[in-house]
Each structure stands twice: as structure tokens, then as C-alpha cells.
């Protein structure tokens, strides 16, 4: 078994810490857990790096208003568009410019009302740049500018280049990009800033006169900028024009990452297929048809700012109702039911009468390396993105398909290594049917070719199997049979992964191939098991995400206790039977039984009746009266000793009396003989 690294670290057993914690420590722990569970949403670090999300690049002015943005659905840190904010939109509401009364909303209009020339002449001199009338905007387009960064500077550079009062360009050599002739083409900054259009002065004047704002910038990300992960907090620059007075503006670039956009509410054909909650996992519901995204249409009322921005791809999402999440009992029972369907398709004889048990502590899943065929796709809907990543598999076995730079400690899991074609358009690498990618960054249903780094990361295609233990029917009956006391042997358990491998082929390594290409019953069982696995992984990931910012040891303890509480509720509710630290469900050919404790009681009663029929009349005394056995074993010794004394006592006493009388008679005879011998001697004299 191999531990596949991930962001969620598994720690050793921490039960000894519980006995060392005082009541005050428990109070602090409860407060900490309340803060963790009641905190905000999941951070970006908890997300699957291959999962597409809504990325919004924003350009903010000095006033903090968003003057330009663009959106797309892509994996994080893979989409680097060209940003095109207008200079006059950045200068709106600034007292240092000639449009202090123009807010951001008016700057986004098709043709904002120009200030009257009388007021404009008071603010700027003839021949100066500005935003209040067409000629001033046109002169701006032909001017040179330079850009200085605020972030990423050392203390000495910050003192030398100044702050907002100088737009971070207090001295020369602080600028990093721009249109100046003295600037190098290769920028050492995170971005490069140029003019978006290079038209002649006359054409520029006509364009500025017709469309209002006409000075969009062209901001591109450098290779250094694409490696930075600090765009979420935003980075700020100062832009100054190489003209008299060096006027300028400040702008901030920020990335906003959110989940997939919510679907609209309305009539849809998929609603017809929805019914009451399913009572069986025999077949999954049919997938709704996917619709191609409609082409984006230009808006006749769009501004020059809007037309210069990149139009994001619009995707039509299938409407679904917000169904409540499954309860703990339904989720765990569906997991057992899916395991039964898969096991019944591979080894029907094993499911005639048995118990399938869920363990309280991790690991909850084990993986078998798979060698199924993979496919490339640009359709992100083909991936099961509902399940987050960042989960670690502690037990991976078998031989399967690997990609990336596999370390020496994991090469025995690979019988084939695949190279990813990362060039070209962005694509997703889909695993074979019912498979996952177990990567060094965590568990993921799909791989993004733009995110995956072949020189650093590695992934193994695996078949996920829940850690479910198999016991024959007699094991639970013996564990709960208190009417027949005897020394019980330790129960021998088999995991579901071992049973699937033994039921299909002779080994787990080759058995994984049969899991991919099996009969129709097996495919249906695997589909049902996959649905249950997805629901359970989502619940586990939610627990990990809420606790990720806390101590790793605390996360593991709470996560283990959380599954233990789930199983405890099932056991106390009579839905499963407890065997050591496992929650067991009764299985027969009809499937998993929800009321397993009731089924166990029926089995025990039936076994008791059969045993009573085969017993003699005196054997029933010991079964009907347990105290009689204890009383008899207590007084049996003294009774046997008393009986022996009564039987053998008279004989022993008689023998002893006879022996004493014999000895007394012998003594008397000796005394008489001595007297008679003396008289005889006297007569002879």
C-alpha cells in the first residue's frame, strides 16, 4: 500500500491527547470549532486546481471603482487576457484632470457629453492633453507615457520612487513599461502597457469625436506575471504622460475567482424527468442533452470601451431544481447499496446472506490503479466537477496508467506512462469510465492541460473503492448471541476491493481491467456505486475545507469523529449493527436492509428456536435459568465432599475401632503371659 501525497495530511492516532485536556481546554476547543465551522466560504487553496471557475479580471481606478472587466469560465491561473481600460475612464472623478464631475457610470456611456469649451479652456491650456473634448483626447493618443509599479518594490526602491503623490515615479529608472523610446522591449515587471490602437492623428481625431472615449490601453501579462498568485488581492501601478506637468492616473488590476454562475429559474424539459427521491440505485437517471453555446452577438449600443474588451464565452446551463442534500443515513446507505450491486454482479454467491460494514475511522477509500483508455475534450461539462479535490488516498495498489514525473517510490504502480500534449488550446484529460485521477495535488475527476506540470506533478488513474468490510452471516450472529456463551474467535474480514478483485479475476492488478470492461450488470453496479461515492466525497470534502485553516491534528480528530458520529446515529437508530468499530448492514439477494438491527434480532430469535428444539429437557434448565448454573457450580464442591463423608465415613470409623481393639487385646495377652510364666518357674523350684 502506498500513501499518495496531497494537501490533506494524515496524522497518527491522537487518542492520548484527549485524556490530557482539562475542562478549560475543551471549552476553548469548542469555541475554536465554532469559529471554524461558522467562518466564511472555502478558500481558493481548498479547490480542485483543474476545476473551471468563473474568472473576472477587473481594472480599478484611483477611486476604487471598476472601470473595465472581462469574464470567462476557465481553471484558475490559466486564462491571461489582454486588458483594455480607457485612460479617461481611469481619470473620471479625479480633481487633477479636467473631468472631475464625471463618474464611472457616465464614463461608460457611448458618447459622454463633452464639457462646454468655456469650462474646458479654464482647466487646460491649448495644446494640452485631457478628456473633456475631442481634440484633447486626440492629443492624448499621440502622447508617450511610462508606468511605475507600487507593489513588489524593496524599501530602498519605495523611498526613491515615492508614493501616490508622484504615482510611484518620483525619479527616473522607476518606470518598468510604457511607450517611451528609452524603455526596453522586455519588461521586468508583471505586465506590459501600450496603446491599443496605432492610427494616424487625423483618423484618431475623427474616432475620438465620434465615439467619445478613444484611448484604450493594451495591458498584457508577462511570463513573470503569469507565475504570480497575488492577483486576487490586486496590484497597483501609476501611469504618467511624458508631457509638460507629467499628468497621470493610478490603476489596479485584480482577479476575482468565484464558483460557476448560478442557473436561471424557468421551464425546462429536464424538470419532467425529476421525480420523488429514489428508493433504489439500480440505474442512474439519464443525462440531459447538452446544448451548444450560442454565438455572442454585438450590441449596437456598446461603447468603444465595451467593444475593446474581450467578450467572454457565454454558455447555456441546463436548469435544475435545488434539491436538498442527502441525509447522513441516505448517503451512507446508498454507499452500501452501491457496493452490494457491484459485488452481486461479480460474485453473486457472496451476497446470498452477509453483512457489509462501514468503518468509523479513516481511510474511507482505497484505490486500484487502472489501465483504461483516456480521452481529450474541451467540454468541461463531461467532468464531475461537483466533487472537490484536495483529498488524499492512503492506500493505492495495483498497476495502471500514470502521467507526469512519477517518483521512484510510486513507479511500481505504473505499467504505462503517458505524456500530455500541453501545446495548443486548453483541453481536459478525461479518465476511463468510473475512474479518477489520483494526483500529487489531490483527487480530481479531470486534468487540465494548462494546469498540469509534467516536470513536477504526477497522476495515477485509479478505480475508487469505498473501505467496506465483508462478513458472513454467522459472524454477527455469534457476536450478538449471548445465550450460548463461549470463547469467540476474532472475526476475519475482507474488504470490498479484495472481493471485487477475487470475484472478477485472480488478482487485483488485472481485476481492475475487468472493472472497466465488465458485463452490463457490473457497469450498472459501478455506476450506482460511483453516484454514492461522489455524494460521500462531497460531504468529506466539505468537512476538510471547513477545517483546513485549523491545525492538521485537530482536522483529523474532528474528521474522524464526524464519521463516527454519523455511524453512531445509524446504530442508535437501529439502521445498522455494531461490530467493534464498524457499522454493519445486512445483505441478501434483494439488496441492503435498512433496518439491520431488526433483521439481526429476527435471525437471533430464529437461531434460538432452532437450538431449543435440538436440546434435551434438562439442557433447557441452564438456558431458561442462568442463575441456576452459577448456583450449581458454587455448591457442587461442598455437596460432593459431604456425600463422600457420608458414604465412606462409617467404614473408616469401624476399621479404626477394630484396629484399636486388636491392639488393646494384644497388650492384655502379653501381660497375662508374663504372670503365668512366673508361677511356672516357682513350681519347678
UniProtKB/Swiss-Prot annotation:
Task: List the InterPro entries hit by this protein, alphabetically.
Answer: FMuLV_rcpt-bd, TLV/ENV_coat_polyprotein
Stretches assigned to coiled coil: 520-570, 580-616
Q: Where is this region: Disordered?
A: 276-309
Residues carrying lipid (S-palmitoyl cysteine): 651
Biological process terms in GO annotation? fusion of virus membrane with host plasma membrane; symbiont entry into host cell; virion attachment to host cell
Motif mapping: YXXL motif: 676-679
Hey, what's the signal peptide range on this chain? 1-41
Give me the Gene Ontology terms describing cellular component: host cell plasma membrane; membrane; viral envelope; virion membrane
Spans within the Extracellular topological domain: 42-632
Record topology, Cytoplasmic segments = 654-685
* CX6CC, short sequence motif: residues: 576-584
Q: Where is this site: Cleavage?
A: 489-490, 669-670
Concerning Pfam families, the annotation shows:
TLV_coat (PF00429)
- Feature: compositional bias, Polar residues: 299-309
Disulphide bonds annotated for this chain are: 148-169, 161-174, 354-357, 354-584, 576-583
Q: Where is this region: Immunosuppression?
A: 559-575
What are the protein's UniProt keywords? Cleavage on pair of basic residues, Coiled coil, Disulfide bond, Fusion of virus membrane with host cell membrane, Fusion of virus membrane with host membrane, Glycoprotein, Host cell membrane, Host membrane, Host-virus interaction, Lipoprotein, Membrane, Palmitate, Signal, Transmembrane, Transmembrane helix, Viral attachment to host cell, Viral envelope protein, Viral penetration into host cytoplasm, Virion, Virus entry into host cell
Q: Where is this region: Fusion peptide?
A: 492-512
Which residues are reported to be glycosylated?
301, 344, 415, 421, 433, 453
Could you describe the subunit structure of this protein?
A: The mature envelope protein (Env) consists of a trimer of SU-TM heterodimers attached by a labile interchain disulfide bond.
What information about domains appears in the record's comments?
The 17 amino acids long immunosuppressive region is present in many retroviral envelope proteins. Synthetic peptides derived from this relatively conserved sequence inhibit immune function in vitro and in vivo.
Describe its function: The surface protein (SU) attaches the virus to the host cell by binding to its receptor. This interaction triggers the refolding of the transmembrane protein (TM) and is thought to activate its fusogenic potential by unmasking its fusion peptide. Fusion occurs at the host cell plasma membrane.
- What is this protein's name? Envelope glycoprotein
Identify the species of origin. Gibbon ape leukemia virus
Amino acid at each position: 500500500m502506498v500513501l499518495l501525497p496531497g494537501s490533506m495530511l494524515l496524522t497518527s492516532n491522537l487518542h492520548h491527547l484527549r485524556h490530557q485536556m482539562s475542562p478549560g481546554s475543551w471549552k476553548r476547543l469548542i469555541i475554536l470549532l465554532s469559529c471554524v465551522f461558522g467562518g466564511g466560504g472555502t478558500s481558493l487553496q481548498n479547490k480542485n486546481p483543474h476545476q473551471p471557475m468563473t474568472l473576472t479580471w477587473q481594472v480599478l481606478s484611483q477611486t476604487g471603482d471598476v472601470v473595465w472587466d472581462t469574464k470567462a469560465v476557465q481553471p484558475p491561473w490559466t486564462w491571461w487576457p489582454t486588458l483594455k481600460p480607457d485612460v479617461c475612464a481611469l481619470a473620471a472623478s479625479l480633481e487633477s484632470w479636467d473631468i472631475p464631475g464625471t463618474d464611472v457610470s457616465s464614463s461608460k456611456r457611448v458618447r459622454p457629453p463633452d464639457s462646454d469649451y468655456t469650462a474646458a479652456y479654464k482647466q487646460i491650456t491649448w495644446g494640452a492633453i485631457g478628456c473633456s473634448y475631442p481634440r484633447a483626447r486626440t492629443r492624448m493618443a499621440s502622447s508617450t507615457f511610462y508606468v511605475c509599479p507600487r507593489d513588489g518594490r524593496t524599501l530602498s526602491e519605495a523611498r526613491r520612487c515615492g508614493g501616490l503623490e508622484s504615482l510611484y515615479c518620483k525619479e527616473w529608472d522607476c518606470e518598468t513599461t510604457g511607450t517611451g523610446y528609452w524603455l526596453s522591449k522586455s519588461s521586468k515587471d508583471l505586465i506590459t502597457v501600450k496603446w491599443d490602437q496605432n492610427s494616424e492623428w487625423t483618423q484618431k481625431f475623427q474616432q475620438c469625436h465620434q465615439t467619445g472615449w478613444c484611448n484604450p490601453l493594451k495591458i498584457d501579462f508577462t511570463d513573470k506575471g503569469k507565475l504570480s498568485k497575488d492577483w486576487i488581492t490586486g496590484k497597483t501601478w501609476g501611469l504618467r504622460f511624458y508631457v509638460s506637468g507629467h499628468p497621470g492616473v493610478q490603476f489596479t488590476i485584480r482577479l476575482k475567482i468565484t464558483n460557476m454562475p448560478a442557473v436561471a429559474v424557468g421551464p425546462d424539459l429536464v424538470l419532467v424527468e425529476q421525480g420523488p427521491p429514489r428508493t433504489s440505485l439500480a440505474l442512474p437517471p439519464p443525462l440531459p442533452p447538452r446544448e451548444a453555446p450560442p454565438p455572442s452577438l454585438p450590441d449596437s449600443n456598446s461603447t468603444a470601451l465595451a467593444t475593446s474588451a474581450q467578450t467572454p464565452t457565454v454558455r447555456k446551463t441546463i436548469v435544475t431544481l435545488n434539491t436538498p442534500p442527502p441525509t447522513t443515513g441516505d448517503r451512507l446507505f446508498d454507499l452500501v447499496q452501491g457496493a452490494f450491486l457491484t459485488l452481486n454482479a461479480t460474485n453473486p454467491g457472496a451476497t446470498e446472506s452477509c453483512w457489509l460494514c462501514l468503518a468509523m475511522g479513516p481511510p474511507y477509500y482505497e484505490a486500484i490503479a487502472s489501465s483504461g483508455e483516456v480521452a481529450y475534450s474541451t467540454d468541461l461539462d463531461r467532468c464531475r466537477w461537483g466533487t472537490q479535490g484536495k483529498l488524499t488516498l492512503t492506500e493505492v495498489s495495483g498497476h495502471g496508467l500514470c502521467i507526469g514525473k512519477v517518483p521512484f517510490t510510486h513507479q511500481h504502480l505504473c505499467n504505462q506512462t503517458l505524456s500530455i500534449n500541453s501545446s495548443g488550446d486548453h483541453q481536459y484529460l478525461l479518465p476511463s469510465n468510473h475512474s479518477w485521477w489520483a494526483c500529487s495535488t489531490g483527487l480530481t475527476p479531470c486534468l487540465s492541460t494548462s494546469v498540469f506540470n509534467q516536470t513536477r506533478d504526477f497522476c495515477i488513474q485509479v478505480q475508487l473503492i469505498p473501505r467496506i468490510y465483508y462478513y458472513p452471516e454467522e459472524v454477527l450472529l455469534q457476536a450478538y448471541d449471548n445465550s450460548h456463551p463461549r470463547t469467540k474467535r476474532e472475526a476475519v474480514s475482507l474488504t470490498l476491493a479484495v472481493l471485487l478483485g477475487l470475484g472478477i479475476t485472480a488478482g487485483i492488478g488485472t481485476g481492475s481491467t475487468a472493472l472497466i470492461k465488465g458485463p452490463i450488470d457490473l457497469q450498472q453496479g459501478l455506476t450506482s456505486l460511483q453516484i454514492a461515492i461522489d455524494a460521500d466525497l462531497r460531504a468529506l470534502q466539505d468537512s476538510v475545507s471547513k477545517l483546513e485553516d485549523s491545525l492538521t491534528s485537530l482536522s483529523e480528530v474532528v474528521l474522524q469523529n464526524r464519521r463516527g458520529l454519523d455511524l453512531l446515529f445509524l446504530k442508535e437508530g437501529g439502521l445498522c449493527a455494531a461490530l467493534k468499530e464498524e457499522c454493519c448492514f445486512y445483505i441478501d439477494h434483494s439488496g441492503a436492509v435498512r433496518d439491520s438491527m431488526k433483521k439481526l434480532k429476527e435471525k437471533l430469535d430464529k437461531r434460538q428456536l432452532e437450538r431449543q428444539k435440538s436440546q434435551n429437557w434438562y439442557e433447557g434448565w441452564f438456558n431458561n435459568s442462568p442463575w441456576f448454573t452459577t448456583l450449581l457450580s458454587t455448591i457442587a464442591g461442598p455437596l460432593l465432599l459431604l456425600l463422600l463423608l457420608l458414604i465412606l465415613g462409617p467404614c473408616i470409623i469401624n476399621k479404626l475401632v477394630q484396629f484399636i481393639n486388636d491392639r488393646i487385646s494384644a497388650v492384655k495377652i502379653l501381660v497375662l503371659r508374663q504372670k503365668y510364666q512366673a508361677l511356672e518357674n516357682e513350681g519347678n523350684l
